[in-house]
């Protein structure tokens, strides 16, 4: 099967039809959710943080970051994907239409951390004569380093096409000032194998990635998600949703009462 970046540029490939799959296809949602939770786990943020989500797409990773107490800003090159994200009732943070290959357009030291799911492999896509992969990589990592606080961590899941492209990405990140390496989850499995570029922007703390890899017996992201849902009661979830809708200015949001979240008796 052809890789998406071989078919068309991202702003064209992720059109209304393709973007719609991210809100209707449960398999895509499940995979994206699992990778997003793993990226946030590797980010290892100390308390609520200000996070940039690069290539946020339909907002799945943005939403998961917010559900863990973080403030998340999303950026993506596809208008269709951002439209899907805007239609979501879950996302509170801002969304930005931007090509990461032209640089990360934020002030120095803005973000505590950065996540990215299935995005940075597009930087190697030379779909236009002006898009030189090495130049785009340089611009991306240099501006990303500047936009992060010192000691901040970036975790980017991606699909490397070749060992050469994988090394090219790692070398460019190091030249920009980052420390770190690549974490490979489930390295023995062809279907479950996932690559995460884990980077640290300076700071005094040493980044050790040797113990970060998951094998087949490792922690299951679905189990973590289930436990998290169990920790929030039905009443708490309903009140949380109501509060979100009020902040967005939605009309006719029911008032909270002692009956909120209670199961109704069967009708006669």
Swiss-Prot record:
Belongs to the class I-like SAM-binding methyltransferase superfamily. BUD23/WBSCR22 family. GO terms for biological process: rRNA (guanine-N7)-methylation. Its main location: cytoplasm. The keyword Transcription does not apply. The keyword Cytoplasm applies. It is an enzyme of class 2 (transferase). It catalyses: a guanosine in 18S rRNA + S-adenosyl-L-methionine = an N(7)-methylguanosine in 18S rRNA + S-adenosyl-L-homocysteine. This is 18S rRNA (guanine-N(7))-methyltransferase bud23. Gene3D superfamilies: Vaccinia Virus protein VP39 (3.40.50.150). InterPro entries: Bud23-like, Bud23_C, Methyltransf_11, SAM-dependent_MTases_sf. GO terms for cellular component: cytosol; nucleolus; nucleus. Residues 246-268 are annotated as: Disordered. S-adenosyl-L-methionine-dependent methyltransferase that specifically methylates the N(7) position of a guanine in 18S rRNA. Important for biogenesis end export of the 40S ribosomal subunit independent on its methyltransferase activity. Disulfide bonds: none annotated. PANTHER family: 18S RRNA (GUANINE-N(7))-METHYLTRANSFERASE-RELATED, METHYLTRANSFERASE-RELATED. One of its GO terms (molecular function) is rRNA (guanine) methyltransferase activity. It is found in: Cytoplasm; Nucleus. It comes from Schizosaccharomyces pombe (strain 972 / ATCC 24843) (Fission yeast). Keywords: Cytoplasm, Methyltransferase, Nucleus, S-adenosyl-L-methionine, Transferase. Its EC number is 2.1.1.-.
């Amino acid at each position: 099967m052809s890789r998406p970046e071989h078919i068309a540029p991202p702003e064209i490939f992720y059109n209304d039809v393709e973007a719609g799959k991210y809100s209707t296809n449960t398999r895509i949602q499940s995979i994206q959710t699992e990778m997003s939770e793993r990226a946030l786990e590797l980010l290892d943020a100390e308390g609520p943080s200000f996070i940039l989500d690069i290539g946020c797409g339909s907002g799945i990773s943005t939403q998961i970051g917010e559900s863990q107490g973080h403030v998340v800003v999303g950026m993506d090159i596809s208008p269709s994907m951002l439209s899907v994200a805007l239609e979501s009732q879950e996302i509170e943070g801002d969304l930005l239409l931007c090509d990461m290959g032209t640089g990360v357009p934020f002030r120095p030291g803005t973000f505590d951390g950065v996540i990215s799911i299935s995005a940075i492999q597009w930087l190697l896509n030379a779909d236009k004569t002006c898009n030189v992969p090495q130049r785009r990589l340089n611009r991306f990592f240099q501006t990303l380093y500047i936009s992060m606080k010192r000691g901040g961590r970036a975790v980017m899941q991606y699909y490397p096409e070749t060992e050469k492209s994988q090394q090219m990405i790692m070398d460019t990140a190091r030249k920009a000032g980052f420390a770190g390496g690549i974490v490979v989850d489930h390295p023995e499995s062809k279907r479950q194998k996932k690559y995460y570029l884990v980077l640290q922007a300076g700071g005094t703390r040493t980044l050790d990635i040797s113990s970060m890899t998951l094998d087949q017996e490792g922690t299951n992201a679905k189990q973590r998600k289930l436990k998290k849902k169990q920790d929030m009661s039905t009443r708490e979830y309903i009140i949380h949703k109501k509060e979100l809708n009020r902040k967005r200015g939605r009309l006719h949001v029911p008032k909270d009462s002692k009956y909120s979240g209670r199961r109704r008796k069967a009708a006669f």
